[in-house]
């Protein structure tokens, strides 16, 4: 909640714009620093936000987004992995050893991702992003899903704020599929990776509906 509150301040509009633009991960960004006499350009902005927020505080941002006020600029919709907790009155004590094998596997995956190599421009020596594509089977699955998804978005059964949120799934689903694919060391995004992403998307939509 501290991050969202800081982005609400009038003197922090530039930071809010950075978070809005950094969602796509394929653009640069210029910080205007007049007092220092120069602008600061970030060639490629890609932001990930990890954290938690109390449901009560989140409600105020949802209301601002739905009402069409100052919060209706698409920032909240960019938090596509948000989940809403269950209110379980029964306490269950969980006391078990950490899964060492899973922790080791996770660290190995993080190391593998950190070692990914960029392409290099032969003339300028500039680093270029590596492009990953769907496998033919995954592409067919994505095309079928996209037709069904776009039809659902156009059925006029959702609030405009919900439509805005769900429209981000056009990027979110391929992004999750790519994460799954990279974690598994695939050369192309496979059918199974996309299938996992679609299942995750169904789960996230159920929480968005809440």
Predicted region positions:
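Phosphate-handling catalytic cores of nucleic-acid transaction enzymes
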Residues: 1-210
């Amino acid at each position: 909640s501290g991050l969202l509150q800081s982005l609400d301040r009038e003197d922090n509009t530039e930071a809010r714009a950075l978070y809005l633009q950094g969602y796509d991960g394929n653009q640069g960004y210029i910080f205007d620093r007049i007092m220092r006499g120069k602008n600061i350009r970030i060639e490629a902005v890609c932001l990930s936000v990890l954290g938690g927020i109390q449901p009560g505080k989140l409600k105020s941002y949802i209301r601002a987004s739905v009402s069409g006020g100052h919060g209706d600029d698409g920032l909240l919709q960019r938090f596509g992995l948000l989940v809403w907790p269950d209110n379980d009155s029964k306490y269950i004590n969980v006391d078990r050893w950490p899964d060492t094998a899973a922790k080791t596997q996770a660290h190995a995956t993080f190391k593998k991702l950190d070692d990914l190599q960029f392409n290099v421009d032969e003339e300028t020596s500039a680093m270029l992003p590596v492009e990953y594509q769907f496998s033919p089977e995954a592409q067919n699955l994505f095309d079928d899903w996209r037709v069904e998804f776009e039809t659902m978005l156009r059925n006029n059964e959702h609030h405009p704020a919900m439509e805005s949120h769900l429209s981000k799934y056009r990027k979110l689903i391929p992004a999750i599929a790519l994460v799954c694919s990279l974690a598994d060391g695939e050369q192309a995004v496979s059918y199974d990776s996309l299938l996992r992403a679609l299942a995750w998307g169904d789960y996230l939509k159920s929480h968005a509906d809440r």
